[in-house]
Amino acid sequence: MQIRFLFLLCLLLLGAACKKNDTPVTPQPTFGKEVQVTKTAEPAVPLPAAPLFSQPLATTIIEATNEALPIWRSFAKNRPALIIAANTPAMLAVPAELRTEVDALLNNADDKELTKRSSPNNPDPLLLPIMSLSAALDAGWFSQVLWIFPSKNLPEQLELATFQQQLIAAGIATPDEATSFTLSQGNFSGIIRGRPFTAAPAATLPPLEQSALLHIDADYFKPLYSGEIKTPIYPLMVDFLNKLKAQNWKIAAATVVLSNQQFDALPLQTRFLGKDLAAVLQNPQMLKDSFPRQWERRANALYLENFMQKEEIHKLYLEMEKIDPRDPDVKFGLYNISRQRNQPDHALVYLKSAVQIDPAYALEYLALAQLASEKNLPEKAVVMLQFARAALPENPFILTQTVHTLLTNNQQEEAKALKPKLATLKWSKIYYPEQVGAQEAILKLLEGK
């Protein structure tokens, strides 16, 4: 599908980010200065902000980037800068045929409707999470953008021509926008959607005079993490946060994406990462002090996985559970280690406990359903899918997968029982054309046609 193809291209990008301009019509990139670029003639309202990590920061944990839209919109009158640290900057352009509707959604819908119509679990969305920042720029919410992209390369290894080509291929920039970019001191700088846009690795972050919002996607660490031996996750996180702190940027609020329910999602084992990032933003003293003992135990458990120390890992997670019985990440850790210890019944009990506290962990049932199908155990696959549906009833993909599995298992009556629910799904012909045809075929099959 074209949208998914473009998104995969997005993941190849190295960066883009933040500039200044005094002219609303044709802004010129002026590195790091405060800008007044607005969609309307209304002046921006000054935004109260404090240097990052100088005090607790209002931080919202979200599942997918689209959930940041209502928060960003609440600051739109201030026209702040946006600093986004992510593997991909959610800058895929909104399809031309939907831009009028998307503009109306962003400007007129209430927060609930805005989130719903952009959700990754909506079969008929107006925009996808990977379009969130693109849509926000179209709406004029931000004056400039700084994208902090993950990179293991040295600044001198970055290539402008390659970056420009990738911007165009990924649908992030038009050819004219791409040619506006320059490369200096490890920063790509240009104009996208009429806004100064800069991309930089954490090693060469630019100054920024203007107050900003901060958006961190846990997937930022995906290309940087190579296991606990080479790149232990907590030191990696601390190094990144210290680089942000050194800039002394004025930040008004932050959003942190867990990124387990977006396209190209992070594995559920990483779900703790976004929560811990948010904890440090909310309590900056943690960056100076030793991290909580629970985090040390988790780090040790992750490290010991490299040496198959199942009993020691199990012991660590049991200690963590005793300290915080309501931590779903610990329950999920116990689920994983119980599977490794060949205790499937215990594992399912821990998984159920994790799901009861944090329903997103029900996505693991999909992996178990796939495993059961591969082992030619369709009945168990159906049971796992039913568990997933019970915890995540609004996820249309689970429903369609359940019906497909039932039909594959010749459970016609059980599949027909889901037909009314399946028939209510309206799939987007733009984003999910293959689902439109598949659903029509399944409904005809269930009707006996």
Which residues does each PLM region occupy?
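TPR/TPR-like (Sel1-like) alpha-helical repeat modules
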Residues: 387-392, 403-430
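C-terminal motif of bacterial Sec signal peptides marking the signal peptidase cleavage site
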Residues: 14-17
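TPR alpha-solenoid repeat register
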Residues: 330, 364, 398, 431-432
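TPR/TPR-like alpha-solenoid repeats
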Residues: 337, 371, 405, 422-425, ...
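Bacterial signal peptide processing site
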Residues: 19-21
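Catalytic cores of soluble, metal-dependent hydrolases
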Residues: 31-62, 68-78, 129-131, 142, ...
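Alpha-helical positions within canonical tetratricopeptide repeat
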Residues: 312, 346, 380, 413-417
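Active-site histidine-anchored catalytic micro-motif
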Residues: 56-156, 160
